[in-house]
Amino acid sequence: MSSFLEFAKPKMLDIKRKINFASGEKTDESVQPQQQTEQSSAQQTTPSAKAVSNPFITPLTESTPGMSESWVELAPSRTSLCSSVDINMVIIDEKDKDSRLSPVSIAQSPHVEFESLEQVKYKLVREMLPPGKNTDWIWDWSSRPENTPPKTVRMVQYGSNLTTPPNSPEPELYQYLPCESDSLFNVRVVFGFLVTNIFSFVVGAAVGFAVCRKLIKHHRQ
């Protein structure tokens, strides 16, 4: 009996090895799907980790009723962009207005907005005169009220386009030109009237005499 067991022991060991090998293959096959499921779950979790790093994407929590877990991208809309652009334009316009309203000296900038015509006159006179001369008297003289005549005088004065036609002589020549008042009883008017009447009477009498003479001759024949 012992000899039989000793003889069969190697065979039994071989059978156990085969059984263990078969069971090991089964365990490997069962482990592989588990690894695949773990890899798929890891792949599913990686985009979530990437999404969390994006500040414009916020995940919906599981506490939201009636909705499954999803990702919503909060990109800036057109209305928000337009409103931001409008705000920037308003700020720029306000800055431009402030820069225009700020006082600007004549020496700093060539583009100066003068308040009145008197300041323009003063600046032109200062540019025309040589440096070093006092021009305060010119400013006082030009700013006096009597130097600016009223509108009625300016419209009636000679040389204005409102009173003289473009082809009229100069105002200085009026005193040398003969200018007389035209009336009905003037000597020239009466003389011309008489001369024209006498001439027309003579011409009419001559024409009438010629016509009458021809008629008389024709009647005698």
From Swiss-Prot:
What is this protein called in UniProt? Answer: NIP3 homolog
Cross-referenced InterPro entries: BNIP3
- What do mutants without this gene show? RNAi-mediated knockdown causes an increased sensitivity to stress and inhibits mitophagy which leads to an accumulation of defective mitochondria that have increased mass, altered network morphology, decreased ATP levels, increased reactive oxygen species (ROS) generation, membrane depolarization, increased oxygen consumption and increased cytoplasmic Ca(2+) that intensifies under stress conditions. RNAi-mediated knockdown in daf-2, isp-1, or clk-1 mutant backgrounds suppresses their increased lifespan phenotype.
Q: Which family does it belong to?
A: Belongs to the NIP3 family.
What membrane topology is annotated for this entry?
Answer: Single-pass membrane protein
Region: Disordered, residue numbers: 24-55
Where does this protein come from, organism-wise?
Caenorhabditis elegans
The organism's place on the tree of life at top rank: Eukaryota
Post-translational modifications: Ubiquitinated and degraded by the proteasome. Under oxidative stress conditions, ubiquitinated at Lys-26 in a pink-1 dependent manner. Colocalizes with pdr-1 and may be ubiquitinated by it.
